[in-house]
Amino acid sequence: YKISTENNIDYGLVNKDFKGSTNISVVSNNKKYKQLTIGIGDEYKIINRFPSITTAFSRSNYVRSQNIETAYRTELLNGLYSEFKFLYCFQTPIDNLDLSSDWFTSLDSVAELAAINFDPYRKMETRIQLTWLPFQKFYYKKNRKVVLGTKFPTINLIYRKGIPKLFKSEVNFDYLELGINDEFPIPHLGKSKWNFQLGSFINNKNLRVIEWKYFRGSD
């Protein structure tokens, strides 16, 4: 077994607030890969990870998230991995922060951007992901499986469910996504990557703006 931890700490000088997160993972690679992770945090999180240049640093793209999560990842068959994740969080806007001395406040004013205002809410979400690496090569070193990878594209199937009412959760949605990606070398230049994703909300009865699926903004 291998135990690892990841910790992040932030401190806002103007608002005098500590924020951060911590998680601990237990990994076993005896014959097949298994990993259990538990984490907790209070952070300012990005809403849209594919913004245009104008909104990349805008405070309108952030929200406060107090969260706790757990995830379990394992190899079902050679090259076929599954991950089960549960996330519970309390989402609140940051419109009550003092941003008068923030470097990007003037940019937000010019672009007429403001921190998103919404009613705080609780969210319970489960996420299931299947990842297939076709014809994955490997070998055993004692009882440890050493993965060499595959020369074929990686296929991902993701299902997200916003669970209503559980622990006062206020969301209700279902999202399904299929993705294919690959990385390949280019002689004398390095590596290149491509990624194709196709997804849709098959249920959006109670879908908040933070849970929307965003596309890359135009620059």
Write out the residue ranges for each language-model feature.
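Outer-membrane beta-barrel pore domains and translocons
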Residues: 6-12, 27, 39-43, 85-91, ...
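Outer-membrane beta-barrel proteins
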Residues: 14-18, 45-49, 91-97, 137-141, ...
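C-terminal outer-membrane beta-barrel translocator/porin domains of Gram-negative envelope proteins
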Residues: 36-41, 51-61, 116, 158-219
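Residues on the lipid-exposed face of transmembrane beta-strands in outer-membrane beta-barrel proteins
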Residues: 1, 9, 22-28, 40, ...
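Transmembrane beta-strands of outer-membrane beta-barrel proteins
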Residues: 3-7, 34-38, 82-84, 128, ...
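Repeated loop/turn-to-beta-strand initiation elements of outer-membrane beta-barrel proteins
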Residues: 2-5, 30-36, 78-82, 92, ...
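Surface-exposed extracellular loop regions of Gram-negative outer-membrane beta-barrel proteins
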Residues: 1-10, 42-45, 136-182
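Residues that define the transmembrane beta-barrel architecture of outer-membrane proteins
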Residues: 16-20, 62-68, 120-126, 172-176
